[in-house]
A protein has these predicted regions:
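E1/E1-like adenylate-forming module used to activate ubiquitin-like modifiers
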Residues: 1-221
Length: 221
């Protein structure tokens, strides 16, 4: 039963925060945790850029995380704010499109477990955006682009209107469900998955910058 998962951080089960948030407090907690990526990811990237043997010192789970960071933040040259916008789009697509679609592929809206709807008893079935034009999404893309400009050391010389003109040309990526992906229903399953030996694959043609400026956040702000 998901309601008795072992608590972690403010008594919220990790699996609830990661896969099945159902309260505003869960989403705030998720967002605060995700903010840490803009610090943690780039510190790992710097270490790998300076020492290609760095990954050998990590567990398979942490190694996969770093490879995923590199694949997101270093797959293309970053020279101006528009490049940062496309990285922001990739972040949005991964978190709010691909992962949600994979979640619904694993657990469809009508999925049943022991004669009961899976999406019940505190689980709220997510909905998917099929466009980028809501003010909420524009706010996300604008804020993330500015944040990435700070990290990459790029001047934020753009207006919201200029950003929106580029967003009008954005295309929703095709989704191909991954048959091998398993999504934990509770913290016990999540812990077991962390111990698997599945390896992430690093992309070719990595583009590192000479300087990164990881961003730190005060969680109480």
């Amino acid at each position: 039963n998901d309601s008795v998962d072992p608590p972690e951080n403010n008594s919220y089960p990790v699996c609830t925060i990661k896969n099945f948030p159902n309260k505003i407090e869960h989403t705030i907690h998720w967002a605060r945790e995700y903010f840490e990526i803009f610090n943690e990811a780039f510190r790992h990237i710097i270490k790998y850029r300076d020492d290609r043997l760095y990954l050998n010192s990590l567990s398979q789970f942490d190694k996969n995380k770093v490879i995923d960071y590199i694949n997101i933040f270093c797959k293309s040259p970053i020279d101006d704010w528009t490049d940062c916008l496309y990285v922001a789009k990739d972040i949005f697509d991964q978190n709010y499109l691909t992962e949600i679609k994979q979640l619904l592929y694993c657990y469809p809206k009508d999925h049943m477990v022991n004669g009961e709807l899976f999406w019940s008893n505190g689980k709220r079935c997510p909905t998917i955006y099929n466009h980028y034009y809501s003010s909420t999404i524009i706010n996300f893309l604008e804020s993330t682009t500015k944040l990435l400009c700070n990290i990459y050391g790029i001047i934020e010389d753009f207006t919201r209107e200029e950003l929106m003109q580029l967003v009008l040309d954005f295309i929703i990526p095709n989704f191909e469900p991954n048959e091998d992906v398993k999504i934990a229903k509770n913290d016990k399953e999540l812990k077991e998955m962390k111990n698997t030996n599945i390896e992430s694959v690093m992309i070719n043609n990595i583009h590192f910058k000479d300087h990164y400026f990881p961003q730190e956040f005060e969680k109480d702000d």
